[in-house]
Curated annotation (Swiss-Prot):
Protein name per its UniProtKB record: Small ribosomal subunit protein uS11
Biological function: Located on the platform of the 30S subunit, it bridges several disparate RNA helices of the 16S rRNA. Forms part of the Shine-Dalgarno cleft in the 70S ribosome.
GO cellular component: ribonucleoprotein complex; ribosome
Keywords per UniProt: Ribonucleoprotein, Ribosomal protein, RNA-binding, rRNA-binding
Organism: Pelobacter propionicus (strain DSM 2379 / NBRC 103807 / OttBd1)
Assembly and binders: Part of the 30S ribosomal subunit. Interacts with proteins S7 and S18. Binds to IF-3.
Amino acid sequence: MASPAKKVVRKKRERKNVTNGVAHIHATFNNTMITIADTAGNVLAWSTSGAKGFKGSRKSTPFAAQVAAEDCAKKAQEHGLRNVEVYVKGPGSGRESALRALQAAGFNISFIKDVTPIPHNGCRPPKKRRV
């Protein structure tokens, strides 16, 4: 006979009082990930296009990135976050729309920096698509 299922006790997220933070927008060709942390690097909130219910090629759209950024901003504002530095990484289509969504959410953006890694002729890139 199977043993009864154990209840999983989830730890309630405590409300930190943080005013300054860092937002990382990672826009890939397939998805957009937004992470908001405090200045020490402790993550306050995160969200992705896939976590917001978009599947397949819809994850890579600017609208999906906007929805994910709005969700992440709402979670971070529960901790009292007001001022944000934004780091954008990747070539995806959700870069600008995620940034605009963070701005529209009421964050005071102090600076925006593009931290996309650029190879000095490193790995061979993927072959071109033939449609």
